[in-house]
Amino acid sequence: MKVSLGNGDMGVSAHLQPCKSGTTRFFTSNTHSSVVLQGFDQLRIEGLLCDVTLVPGDGEEIFPVHRAMMASASDYFKAMFTGGMKEKDLMCIKLHGVNKVGLKKIIDFIYTAKLSLNMDNLQDTLEAASFLQILPVLDFCKVFLISGVSLDNCVEVGRIANTYNLIEVDKYVNNFILKNFPALLNTGEFLKLPFERLAFVLSSNSLKHCSELELFKAACRWLRLEDPRMDYAAKLMKNIRFPLMTPQDLINYVQTVDFMRTDNTCVNLLLEASNYQMMPYMQPVMQSDRTAIRSDSTHLVTLGGVLRQQLVVSKELRMYDERAQEWKSLAPMDAPRYQHGIAVIGNFLYVVGGQSNYDTKGKTAVDTVFRFDPRYNKWMQVASLNEKRTFFHLSALKGHLYAVGGRSAAGELATVECYNPRMNEWSYVAKMSEPHYGHAGTVYGGLMYISGGITHDTFQNELMCFDPDTDKWTQKAPMTTVRGLHCMCTVGDKLYVIGGNHFRGTSDYDDVLSCEYYSPTLDQWTPIAAMLRGQSDVGVAVFENKIYVVGGYSWNNRCMVEIVQKYDPEKDEWHKVFDLPESLGGIRACTLTVFPPEENPGSPSRESPLSAPSDHS
């Protein structure tokens, strides 16, 4: 039982515990520590019982203090007064690493627990706190710096953070500069940045609202401000993404700069940009830091599908904004698609085959292939498949695309095609032993795995593995359940098979809620938690090590669905997380780094420097 007295009790509380010999009472004073601290401070002010005098390194002013008090608040003083240091027995100690202002601030804090900071005394206080290892004061200094960062002082705060190794402050300053760099360009404050911080900013994917040409001009201004800075020209230019500039800007604004024509590194950067722009089809396999999208926004992306009500096929490309918890539109495809294949190489999204019209038999399959470039929010057509195909699987593996099986007006397909971006052409590789459609696939360890599907109107449970180096298929341990129109993905070293459908009895279809994963090293399957609701013919994507299953069709409910279910492999749990804007079957999903639409509205100003040849054959 706890007993507390009123306001006049001097903050006393008591805990009462009955025992055989009577009641034991434990008392606690809530004001004792502050009273003792005030008492020590008064002793210091009056010069009573002080047993050592501290002298700052920059003067002769003396500060009488109590050894025990200083040692209790500082590991530095504890080591000095209790270890084998010569200062242990000295009555007067000169602290050469601390000045008068800093030492007074530290002593006042130790005796009062209070600290006043401004930009005039901050560095003296920081230096003393760092030298004397007063961690609370260091924390207060960090809070003071972070809370006061502005366009006018961010460069100076960054310098202080770097000098005293204040990692949290340094990180905050970097983020502040990245967020406000356009404003710093306008004010000219960026010219005061040290090389290391400017190079970091220019290399960052988090730098927004600046074109590469603007960044190049800013770098040139910084270099020309002081002659010694020109030594950094090549190192600084490595952070400018010249391949993303237009050829006109490269000629008119970049090649006219003297050091870009004379410095070997800079000349090579221009050659790199020229070569990159001359080979638009190869770009996905030519990616580097200088050709990557300048964005740190990676999102779940969905594409196409057939609408539940009108059975109209969609051409929408959407991303899910996790912060706003809403779907946002990117550039739509030129033609609608469902039952298509999608894959990503070098953050370029390929859309292959599928259908533009609703047709459950696959008779309207197409062979066209398009590629989405998120840097410019634009689509371009590339070489078409050798065969029209839908209800097939598409994988990206070792810089190539593999289109596996499917169906068309000619029937079920066993053929497999490989797309080479370097040549912009499709060629046949080893076909499957039997035709398959409605199967699923994923890649792991340089191999492609294909599971289940439908062959001659029969659902399958087999797992096949394709090795692109040997151009051979091998059989692996079969799934425990036959399924088709399911999905498959890789997380870590496990290959997950999820959802789909199969026959109930002899003719009716049934959702498959059971899920399992395959271990390539053990060649065996392990069951996992079942889905909350059936989904077939879905989009699937792995985002932050969670599996997202998007849209599709529920055979038990006989309708397209709008739900998105998330599976957590670590917890073995399913959750319904959000919905699509509408119910869509035959939709596809992936993850892609993009410019969120508010940063790239329609993108008239974000012009692509790349022009593909008009012949798509």
Swiss-Prot record:
Transmembrane segments: none annotated. Residues 154-255 form the BACK domain. Kelch repeats lie at residues 299-347, 348-399, 400-446, 448-493, 495-545, 546-594. It comes from the Eukaryota. Pathway: Protein modification; protein ubiquitination. Residues 50-119 form the BTB domain. GO terms for biological process: cell division; protein ubiquitination; regulation of cytokinesis. PROSITE patterns: BTB (PS50097). Coiled coil: none annotated. InterPro entries: BACK, BTB-kelch_protein, BTB/POZ_dom, Kelch-typ_b-propeller, Kelch_1, SKP1/BTB/POZ_sf. CDD domains: BACK_KLHL9_13, BTB_POZ_KLHL9_13. GO terms for molecular function: cullin family protein binding; ubiquitin-protein transferase activity. Substrate-specific adapter of a BCR (BTB-CUL3-RBX1) E3 ubiquitin-protein ligase complex required for mitotic progression and cytokinesis. The BCR(KLHL9-KLHL13) E3 ubiquitin ligase complex mediates the ubiquitination of AURKB and controls the dynamic behavior of AURKB on mitotic chromosomes and thereby coordinates faithful mitotic progression and completion of cytokinesis. Component of the BCR(KLHL9-KLHL13) E3 ubiquitin ligase complex, at least composed of CUL3, KLHL9, KLHL13 and RBX1. Interacts with AURKB. This is Kelch-like protein 9. It comes from Mus musculus. The gene is Klhl9.
